[in-house]
C-alpha cells in the first residue's frame, strides 16, 4: 500500500534508521519500473535484487548509498548468486531489453490482466492489487486459496498461494492472447 511505504520511509528518516528495499522479486521490471520503490517516490539506503537481473539465471546485486556503503566490509558477505560469465552475458541482454517502452508495456499488461480478472466478477475473488505483472488476488471468506489454485493448475493456469490470497507472476513477455487464455481458464473453472 503506497501510504504504508511512504510512512515507513518517513519513520526511517526521522529515526535515522536504514531503509532497505528487498527487490529480489519486485525488481528489474516486474512492477513496470526498474525497481518497485521508484513507484512510491522513496529512495532506500540499500536495494537488493536478483532473479530478473539475469533472466532467472543466478545473479544478484546490492546497491547502497553513502550512509551504509561501509556496513559490509571485504569478506563479510558471500553469495551463491554472484554470477559467472554466462550469467553476466544474460544480465547484459536484460539491461538492453529494459527500455522505457518495455516497462510501460509491463504496466499496461498488468492493468489489462487486473481489469480482466475483476470483470469476470468471480464469486471467490474479492479484489486484485499490485504493480505491473506482480498481481495479488484477495480470496473472499468461505473460499480456500489452495483449492482455487489447485483447480486452476489442473486446467493449465499456474498461480501461487500467498497467505489467504493468490499471486500471479506471469513472464514479462506474456502476450495478450496468453492473458486472454488465462482469463478464460479462470472463467471456465471458477464461475
Feature map (PLM): residue ranges:
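Conserved N-terminal phosphate-binding loop of PLP-dependent enzymes in the Aspartate aminotransferase
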Residues: 1-191
